[in-house]
Amino acid sequence: AQKPVAILGSSAMRMKDHPLLLKFIEKNQIPFGSSTMAKGMIDENHPLCFGCIERGKRQMQRKFIQSADLVIGLGFDTIEVEYEAWIGNTPLLSIDIETPDIDESVKLVGEVTGDLSNSLSRLLIYPAAENNWTQSELDTHNKNYNEALRPSTEAFTPFKAIDIVRKVLPKDGIITYDVGAHTHQIASQWIAPEPKVCH
């Protein structure tokens, strides 16, 4: 693949050795996003991170993902959101604890099924794969995405409140929120620097 992206999902939260996710991403220099439940499995301040999928400004995230030539699902559990909703025609390589639950519209081109820590440990033995992503492409997407999440206004808005709370909470501060439309803005906008601090 010349332009792969990785999507981290909730099954990754069960990993015995979750730092392997970062090793895999950094070794191969793959841009990554996450589902809501997997936020922070890799620090979302990482320069390769393009944020949360299928929440606020989902169409922007879908367009970015569909510009890739391969999606690598890393522990992506379709209980959160089905691949069919966002993957488009981009081929899928699934690395998960079970076979992906997909219909024939998803182009599954490869599958690694089993313990995620073991699977990634074995994949890390191989030489790094090169790709054609540039940091400026990712930076441009992230800038546009974050600006779209925070439209210009004089009013005190939910996105301003979220930014204030993020600023005053410590790095390991935990935010919890209930179901509802506000989850889309929070999940997209809140930066999780580590696992299990955003739920």
What feature does the model see in each segment?
Residues 38-137:
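Glycine-rich, acidic loop regions that bind phosphate or pyrophosphate groups
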